[in-house]
Each structure stands twice: as structure tokens, then as C-alpha cells.
């Protein structure tokens, strides 16, 4: 401030002196010197303005930085410094204005006041600097200390990162090698010991595992040591000779913790790991879990297994004994042990999956063998069943043919009871023939027909057969027919008759009929749909017919005396229950065949018995559609073919005789041949004069037969004297029913066959077929 005042004083003196020189004594002025002084004054004015602007901007900068930082410790010094700077700036600003108005009294007073205040502020600022400068120096020292600490932290952080990278790199390498080892627990533990010894420069490494059959001992299974004279590592397989107690304090301590433990030099585990000698370096140990997969039994309950651990013991070389185990080394050991545990768990899973796969393969082989045996048994059963059915079919066909002649006698001389017996025999024979066809041909084509039939006639014939079976077995019989039953209904009469006979046969087989103390009862009545709804295990019927329906309840029961009920003992008895048993639960009484038929007919079937076993009953409820209008049952037309010369070729003697009788009944002149070759020889003879040939040849009946019916027909067409003959063949009904592709018709056209008659051959069917063939040709 004193320098500014001196500069202003010198400027004023120079101005006065220059005025004198310019004007001289006579008042004359030099205009060139006047211009230089003016320039200097203008320069001073600009300088004062710039200095004032600079001084006044400094407090603004200080205020800005004061808002960004905490300046509470130097607040007083900063205020003094700001006041000093502001007053200095004001002085320079007023000095700049004095150059334009040098003789203004207010301006001079203001300039004087500003200079005085600036002098006071400068003195106060100078005093404040005595305390401000030491504080500023302390801040600088703290800043340097913080910078040193930051640099050390940065170095430590870099070191930690490098150690982490080195650790992760080592762990990745060890993990990769461990996972690349064979999936076996011993191979994984061996690889772990080898890789840790290589990575940490170990003197020795040992692996202890629980002894098999001795849960209180640990056995040394792997031991790795390095020889001073050999750079290579030697792996020793140690047997049961090296053991350590599982209750050793060091073993218990290692087993109880997940982290690695540093063992003392006098530790029994450390001495045993160094194979008897005192350990030369520091020793560390860590547990490795040997995970086992839970084995589940058939019920799904897991088997409880205790946790099992292996112990990995690591020994440092003697020259590293002073340093010991660092936290970094222990961390590597712990991470590698965790990875080894994961690898062991994977190996356990693979071993379990391999064993399960082997068990499944063995079970699959056993299953395939059982399947093969079952298939062979099924084929054998089917062959036996087909052979039995084929052996029974021809006698049954003969019986059906004979009964058809009895049903249509030349003179109606039969009494009603005889007619009923013949009709019952015919229905039973037809049922047996149809069942054999279903077993052998239509095994997979179980169907239910819906056509009108006489319910009264069906019930009469069923009662007749049931009474006959009861009397033959020595049991009594009682029937209660329902008079209000409809005459004609729509349904499958053959299936209904079959079910009724099965009910009767089931109860008669369960009764000791030889004692004469049993009585069979048969009743039929109309019932409502919801009548049996509240009985146990009731399966409601689903109405499928349209129009008027009727529900018919068939009930067959057997009554026994108490002595017979006590003596009766069967290996498979009805359940002693008073309530009903549905058809789905009666697999031990009725086969699935009957259950399926009942379901297809939209019915229900169950059995019941009393608590004492005296009475049993089987109930069948079926739903029929009423036939609208009266159906006239016209008798079939029996033609009379007078003088028709027929050659019959049949390889079964009984069937040949029955068919011959049927043809003679139709008025034909019949000559029979026992084989196809005999038939061809008769036709080839010159005296043969036949008009029609009936072929009923079956190659299964006579295995040595060289020709079947189609081949014989082809040979007949090749004969010159018999190429015009009419040929009729007899085929099984199931063959025609299942001939979807028309293979039989195609064979008939190719062989020149004029007609087909379905077995069993009956009088009406054969007469109708012969009439059709004669009319067509």
C-alpha cells in the first residue's frame, strides 16, 4: 500500500514538473510531451482497473472453494485475507477514477478512507498469517502422509490381487487335473496329493481313510515323499500296516473343522504321516468329505449313512520350517480340498449310476428272458387252445347239424317239452361253436349285436338248461319266471344266454352238489334303473338306446344246508360280505371276458352272500330296448331237391355222415368221398354223373392231406368232363366275418367256386345256399 501511495505522489510531482517544463516561464507548451504523459496516465488507469478486477475476483473464488470444503479451522484468517483483498481492490478502483477527475473532493475522501481501511486490514491479515501458515503446513504434512498411505494401500491391493490371481490360477490348474483324473476315489485322492506337492513344494504328503470294517481306525492309503537324490516324486501304496486311532485329539480336531489345521511336531498324526520319523518341517492337515449317494429301498425310504471323511496331511521341507504355513498356502489347500470333495461326490454319483445301470441291464435281461418265456408260453397256450378248439369244433358242428334236423322234422310230432329241450340244445351248441370261433379267429374282435329276439323263449331255454345242469349235479332247482316281461326286445341273445349259463355254472361249481343239500334258484323280473343305486359299489348304468327301454334283473342263487355250509372249504371263496361286489372286483369269480361283455351291454353284475355262508347269489341287470310292434317268427323254408346228384368230399367221418344225412333230407342223391384225391378220382371216372360237388376239406384235421378245398376246386375245373359242375364249399363262420379284404371271395372266383356255406352246416342254411346256387346257374 505504501508503494501505491509513493507511486501516486511521484506521478503528481512529475505532472507538476512537466507542466513547468512544457509551459516554461512564458506559458508556452510542448504538445509532443503532452501526448506522452497522457499515454502514461491512460496506461496507469487501465492497470488500476485490471488490478481492482483481480483483487475483487479473489474473494469470489475463496467463497466457492469454502462451499466445497470445510475451512472452519482457518475461518478467521480467511476472513481477514478476504477483507484485505477487497479493500485493495477498492483502492485501485478509486485510483483509476482519480485519473479522470484529479480535483474531485468526494473522490479524494473516498480514496483516503479506502486506503486507511486497507492499511488496517493488511495489518490484521499480517497478524493472522502467524497462525494460518503453521496450520497450512500441518495440512500439507497430513496430505503427504495420506498420499503415502494411499500408495502403500495401492501396493498392498496389487499384491493381494496378484496373490488372488496366482491362487486362482493354481486352483484352476489343480482342479482341472483333479477332474481329469479317473472317476475313482483313490485316483482322485492320489491326484490331489500329487498336484498339491508339486504346487506347494511339499516334502511329503499322506492320505488317511477309514479302515474297512474298523470304524475306529484310519489307514494310510497313499503316501508321497521326495528323495534328496531324486528329483522325481515316489508314490508309495501303504496297506493296513500304518494306522492311527480315530479318537486321536489331532484327528478329532481336524475332523471337526472345515478349515486346514496346523499340527504340532509331536502330533501322532504328523509322525505317522512321515512314516515313523519325526516331521522335519511344518505339518498341516485338512479333512476331505467322501460323499456317498443315498441308497433307496423299494418303499422310497432313504438309508441313513454316517458322514465319512479322509484326512490329507501335508509336510513342508526342512528349510521352510521357520516360515511355516502361511495363510495363503492354507487357503490354497482348503480350496483344493473343496474341489477334491466335489470330484469325490461326482465319482460317487458316477459309481452309483454305473451300478444302477448294471442292475437295470441285469433286470432288463431278466425281463427280456421273462418276456421271451411269456411269449413262448402264450404261443404254446394259443397253439394248445387252437388245437383243442379245432378238435372240439367238428363234433360240435356235427351236433349242431343233427339238432337242426331235429328242429325241422318232416312231421311235427314232437311234444312241447321235447321241442324246448331241442331248442335249448341247439342254442347251447350254437353258443359253444361261436365261442370257439371267437377264441381262435375273432379273438380281438369282441362285439355285441343288437337285433330283435324273443325274451320269453330265451328265458325258457335258460331255465331248461339250468334245471338240467342242477338235476345232473344232484341239486334241487326252483325257478320264478316273471309274467310281465316283454315278449320282444332288442339285444344280443347269444351273449345274454352265455352270461346266464356262466352264472349257473359258477354257483353249481361252488356247491357240494354230491351231498344233495343244495338248491339252485332262478328268477327274472323287471326292475327300475335306480332300484339298486344305494347298494355298495354300485356303478350306474349309462343309457345308450333311444326310445323305450326296459331293465331286466336276472338273479341266480344257491341255497345250502348249515351242515353243507360248515363242511364246504374251497381254496378261493367269495368274500363274506352282505353287500354287493361289482364286476370289476370279481376277477376271482368271473373272468375279464364276462366283465367286458357286461360293460359292452351297458349292464352291471355282482355277487352277494350271507354272513353264515348258507346262501350265495349272482345278480345281472341288463337294459334292453323294447321292440316296437309284433315280430312274426316265420319258420325257415326247407327246400326239396328231388334227384339232385351230389358228390360230398369231407375228411371227417362224423361230419361227413351228418352232412350226408342233411343232403338226403333235402332230397339229394349223395355219394361221399373221404378225401380230395378220392373225389377227383370219382369225377375223373367215365361213369361219374354228378351235378354238384360239396367240399368240406380242412388241412388242419388231416395233416397228411396234400390238397385243401380250393386246390380241389381248381383240379375239378381242369377236368374236361366235370368243368361245368357246380361247386359249394364249407368254410368257418369266423373266416367270412373277418375277411375285410375279400381274400376268400377272390380265392373262390379264381377257383371257380359257385357258393359258400358257413360252418356249422345246418339244414336251413345248406338248403338255402343250394337253392341260390341252382337259381344263379
Swiss-Prot record:
Domain Response regulatory: 645-774
PROSITE patterns, A to Z: RESPONSE_REGULATORY
Top enzyme category: transferase
InterPro entries named among the record's database cross-references: CheY-like_superfamily, ETR, GAF, GAF-like_dom_sf, HisK_dim/P_sf, Sig_transdc_resp-reg_receiver
Cofactor(s) the record lists: Cu cation
Gene3D superfamilies cross-referenced by the UniProt entry: 1.10.287.130, 3.30.450.40, 3.40.50.2300
A GO molecular function held by the record: metal ion binding
Cofactor note: Binds 1 copper ion per dimer.
Modified residues (Phosphohistidine): 390
Residues covered by the Histidine kinase domain: 387-521
Entry GO CC: endoplasmic reticulum; endoplasmic reticulum membrane
GAF domain segment(s): 184-344
Compartments, as annotated in UniProt: Endoplasmic reticulum membrane
Disruption phenotype: Late heading, altered kernel color and viviparous phenotypes.
Family per record: Belongs to the ethylene receptor family.
EC numbers on record: 2.7.13.3
Protein name, UniProt field: Ethylene receptor 4
Pfam families in the cross-refs: ETR1_N, GAF
Keywords noted in UniProt: ATP-binding, Copper, Endoplasmic reticulum, Ethylene signaling pathway, Kinase, Membrane, Metal-binding, Nucleotide-binding, Phosphoprotein, Receptor, Transferase, Transmembrane, Transmembrane helix, Two-component regulatory system
Functional summary from the UniProt entry: Ethylene receptor related to bacterial two-component regulators. Acts as a redundant negative regulator of ethylene signaling.
List of residues binding Cu cation: 88, 92
Entry keyword annotation includes DNA-binding: no
Gene: ETR4
Annotated positions of the 4-aspartylphosphate modification: 696
Coiled coil: none
Amino acid at each position: 500500500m505504501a508503494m501505491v501511495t509513493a507511486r501516486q505522489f511521484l506521478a503528481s510531482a512529475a505532472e507538476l514538473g512537466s507542466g513547468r517544463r512544457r509551459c516554461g516561464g512564458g506559458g508556452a507548451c510542448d504538445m509532443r510531451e503532452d501526448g506522452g504523459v497522457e499515454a502514461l496516465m491512460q496506461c496507469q488507469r487501465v492497470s488500476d482497473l485490471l488490478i481492482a478486477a483481480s483483487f475483487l475476483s479473489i474473494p469470489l473464488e475463496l467463497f466457492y472453494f469454502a462451499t466445497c470444503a470445510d475451512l472452519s479451522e482457518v475461518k478467521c484468517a480467511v476472513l481477514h485475507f478476504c477483507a484485505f483483498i477487497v479493500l485493495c481492490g477498492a483502492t485501485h478502483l478509486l485510483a483509476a477514477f482519480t485519473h479522470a477527475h484529479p480535483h474531485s473532493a468526494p473522490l479524494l475522501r473516498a480514496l483516503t478512507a479506502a486506503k486507511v481501511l486497507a492499511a488496517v486490514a493488511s495489518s490484521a491479515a499480517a497478524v493472522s498469517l502467524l497462525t494460518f501458515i503453521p496450520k497450512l503446513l500441518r495440512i500439507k504434512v497430513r496430505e503427504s502422509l495420506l498420499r503415502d498411505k494411499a500408495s502403500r494401500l495401492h501396493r498392498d491391493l496389487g499384491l493381494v490381487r496378484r496373490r488372488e490371481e496366482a491362487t486362482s490360477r493354481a486352483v484352476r490348474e489343480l482342479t482341472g487335473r483333479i477332474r481329469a483324473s479317473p472317476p475313482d476315489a483313490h485316483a482322485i485322492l492320489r491326484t490331489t496329493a500329487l498336484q498339491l506337492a508339486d504346487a506347494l513344494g511339499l516334502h511329503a504328503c499322506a492320505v488317511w481313510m477309514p479302515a474297512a470294517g474298523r470304524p475306529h481306525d484310519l489307514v494310510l492309503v497313499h503316501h508321497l515323499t521326495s528323495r534328496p537324490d531324486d528329483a522325481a516324486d515316489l508314490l508309495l501304496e501303504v496297506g493296513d500296516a500304518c494306522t492311527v486311532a480315530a479318537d486321536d485329539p489331532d484327528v478329532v480336531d481336524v475332523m471337526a473343522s472345515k478349515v486346514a489345521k496346523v499340527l504340532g511336531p509331536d502330533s501322532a498324526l504328523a509322525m505317522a504321516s512321515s512314516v515313523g520319523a519325526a516331521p522335519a518341517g511344518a505339518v498341516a492337515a485338512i479333512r476331505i468329505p467322501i460323499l456317498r449317494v443315498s441308497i433307496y429301498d423299494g418303499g422310497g425310504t432313504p438309508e441313513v449313512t454316517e458322514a465319512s471323511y479322509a484326512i490329507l496331511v501335508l509336510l513342508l521341507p526342512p528349510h521352510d520350517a521357520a516360515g511355516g504355513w502361511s495363510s495363503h498356502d492354507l487357503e490354497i489347500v482348503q480350496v483344493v480340498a473343496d474341489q477334491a470333495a466335489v470330484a469325490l461326490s461326482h465319482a460317487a454319483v458316477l459309481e452309483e449310476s454305473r451300478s444302477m445301470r448294471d442292475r437295470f441291464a441285469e433286470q432288463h435281461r431278466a425281463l427280456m428272458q421273462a418276456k421271451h418265456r411269456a411269449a413262448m408260453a402264450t404261443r404254446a397256450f394259443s397253439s394248445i387252445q387252437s388245437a383243442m378248439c379245432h378238435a372240439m369244433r367238428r363234433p360240435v358242428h356235427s351236433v349242431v347239424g343233427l339238432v337242426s334236423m331235429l328242429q325241422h322234422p318232416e312231421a311235427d310230432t314232437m311234444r312241447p317239452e321235447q321241442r324246448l329241450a331241442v331248442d335249448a340244445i341247439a342254442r347251447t351248441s350254437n353258443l359253444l361253436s361261436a365261442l370257439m370261433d371267437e377264441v381262435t379267429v375273432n379273438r380281438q374282435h369282441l362285439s355285441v349285436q343288437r337285433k330283435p329276439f324273443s325274451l320269453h323263449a330265451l328265458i325258457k331255454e335258460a331255465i331248461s338248461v339250468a334245471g338240467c345242469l342242477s338235476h345232473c349235479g344232484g341239486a334241487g332247482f326252483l325257478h320264478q319266471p316273471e309274467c310281465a316281461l316283454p315278449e320282444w326286445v332288442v339285444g344280443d341273445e347269444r351273449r345274454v344266454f352265455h352270461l346266464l349259463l356262466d352264472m349257473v355254472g359258477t354257483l353249481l361249481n361252488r356247491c357240494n352238489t354230491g351231498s344233495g343239500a343244495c338248491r339252485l334258484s332262478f328268477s327274472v323280473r323287471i326292475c327300475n334303473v335306480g332300484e339298486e343305486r344305494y347298494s355298495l359299489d354300485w356303478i350306474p348304468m349309462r343309457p345308450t338306446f333311444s326310445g323305450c327301454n326296459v331293465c331286466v334283473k336276472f338273479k341266480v342263487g344257491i341255497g345250502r344246508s348249515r351242515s353243507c355250509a360248515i363242511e364246504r372249504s374251497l381254496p378261493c371263496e367269495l368274500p363274506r360280505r352282505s353287500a354287493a361286489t361289482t364286476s370289476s372286483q370279481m376277477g376271482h369269480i368271473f373272468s375279464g371276458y364276462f366283465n367286458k361283455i357286461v360293460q359292452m351291454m351297458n349292464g352291471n353284475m355282482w355277487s352277494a352272500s350271507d354272513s353264515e355262508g348258507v346262501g350265495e347269489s349272482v345278480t345281472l341287470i341288463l337294459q334292453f330296448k323294447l321292440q316296437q310292434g309284433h315280430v312274426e317268427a316265420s319258420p325257415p323254408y326247407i327246400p326239396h331237391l328231388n334227384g339232385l346228384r351230389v358228390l360230398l368230399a369231407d375228411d371227417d367221418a362224423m361230419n361227413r355222415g351228418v352232412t350226408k344225412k342233411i343232403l338226403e333230407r333235402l332230397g339229394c342223391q349223395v355219394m361221399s368221398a373221404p378225401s380230395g384225391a378220392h373225389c377227383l378220382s370219382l369225377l375223373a371216372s367215365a361213369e361219374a354223373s354228378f351235378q354238384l360237388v360239396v367240399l368240406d376239406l380242412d388241412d388242419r384235421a388231416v395233416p397228411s392231406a396234400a390238397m385243401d378245398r380250393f386246390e380241389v376246386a381248381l383240379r375239378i375245373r381242369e377236368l374236361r368232363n366235370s368243368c361245368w359242375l357246380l361247386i359249394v364249399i364249407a368254410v368257418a363262420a369266423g373266416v367270412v366275418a373277418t375277411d375285410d379284404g375279400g381274400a376268400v371271395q377272390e380265392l373262390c372266383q379264381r377257383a371257380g367256386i359257385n357258393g359258400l356255406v358257413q360252418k356249422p352246416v345246418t339244414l336251413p342254411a345248406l338248403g338255402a345256399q343250394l337253392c341260390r346256387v341252382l337259381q344263379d346257374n
